[in-house]
């Protein structure tokens, strides 16, 4: 590894810019890539919402849910099936695309069709995975592990920048608090901004997840997504991560914590108001 360079204070995925002092941007989409038709339906709806509100949106979805609670749970269509769908969303609908990778060998192939490679929280310290993602030259979004202190993310980011890639996002998604429960410590947002120098994202939907809370699957408390999202945006973050679905109660994964697509635009309008107030009062963002 080479000596780390400083992470970029602003990173751009297509026309969507992330910076702690910039207007809020959004990462949104369904938890799992269910089918081409479903993915295009949600992506088109998000593109229209972004256009109406004047807010940048990156489409997210997972080609493989590799850490399901049960081996019997649906995992997704796989990387081979996902790549042409990712490319179609990016090229035809016009949204930048994010997906998560779980193995170093997936990074280069996924980077062919997406703008942002995401490192899952459970894998945030896996050096080989971080270096492989960084080597693609794509933006790398690292979710802070539920077991990790926010100040420890500086070491994680340094692994990525040591590969010569300054394009890093860091995401807060809650910390383990007893069994099957996560809590969100809003102090983590300015701490990660200070210790990493990277744009900070708040994952409002996984933060209300109840890991393994339903026995063979995870539960969630969807009603608290707007509460935590407002709190985080009031701090002055670069972006929010919100999973959304037309029918979350029948989604194959993470339904209990996804926001119904019909409610998504209203939530974004509120968050944009909070963001404008936070950054207007501080002059240049609060973190």
Curated annotation (Swiss-Prot):
Pathway(s) this gene product operates in, as recorded in its UniProt entry: Carbohydrate biosynthesis; 3-deoxy-D-manno-octulosonate biosynthesis; 3-deoxy-D-manno-octulosonate from D-ribulose 5-phosphate: step 2/3; Bacterial outer membrane biogenesis; lipopolysaccharide biosynthesis
GO molecular function: 3-deoxy-8-phosphooctulonate synthase activity
Keywords: Cytoplasm, Lipopolysaccharide biosynthesis, Transferase
One protein family per Pfam: DAHP_synth_1
Enzyme class: transferase
GO cellular component: a single term: cytoplasm
Gene Ontology biological-process entries: keto-3-deoxy-D-manno-octulosonic acid biosynthetic process
Presence of keyword Repeat: no
Similarity annotation: Belongs to the KdsA family.
Protein known as: 2-dehydro-3-deoxyphosphooctonate aldolase
Native species: Rhodopseudomonas palustris (strain HaA2)
């Amino acid at each position: 590894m080479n000596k780390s360079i400083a992470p970029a204070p602003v990173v751009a995925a297509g026309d969507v810019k992330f910076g702690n002092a910039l207007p809020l941007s959004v990462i949104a989409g369904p938890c799992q890539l269910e089918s081409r038709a479903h993915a295009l339906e949600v992506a088109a709806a998000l593109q229209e919402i972004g256009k109406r509100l004047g807010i940048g949106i990156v489409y997210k979805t997972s080609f493989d849910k590799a850490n399901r609670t049960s081996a019997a749970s649906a995992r997704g269509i796989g990387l081979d099936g996902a790549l042409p769908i990712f490319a179609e969303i990016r090229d035809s609908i016009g949204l930048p695309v994010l997906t998560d990778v779980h193995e170093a060998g997936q990074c280069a192939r996924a980077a062919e069709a997406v703008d942002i490679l995401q490192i899952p929280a459970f894998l945030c310290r896996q050096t080989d995975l971080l270096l492989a993602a960084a080597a693609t030259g794509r933006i790398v979004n690292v979710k802070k592990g539920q077991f990790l202190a926010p100040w420890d993310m500086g070491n994680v980011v340094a692994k990525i920048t040591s590969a010569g890639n300054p394009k890093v996002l860091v995401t807060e998604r809650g910390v383990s608090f007893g069994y099957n429960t996560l809590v969100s410590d809003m102090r983590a947002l300015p701490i990660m901004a200070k210790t990493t120098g990277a744009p900070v994202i708040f994952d409002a939907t996984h933060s209300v997840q109840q890991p393994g809370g339903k026995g063979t699957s995870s539960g969630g408390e969807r009603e608290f997504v707007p509460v935590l999202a407002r709190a985080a945006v009031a701090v002055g973050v670069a972006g929010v991560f919100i999973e959304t679905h037309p029918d979350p109660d029948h989604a194959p994964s993470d339904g209990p914590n996804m926001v119904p697509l019909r409610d998504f635009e209203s939530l974004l309008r509120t968050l944009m108001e909070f963001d404008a107030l936070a950054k207007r009062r501080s002059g240049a963002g609060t973190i």
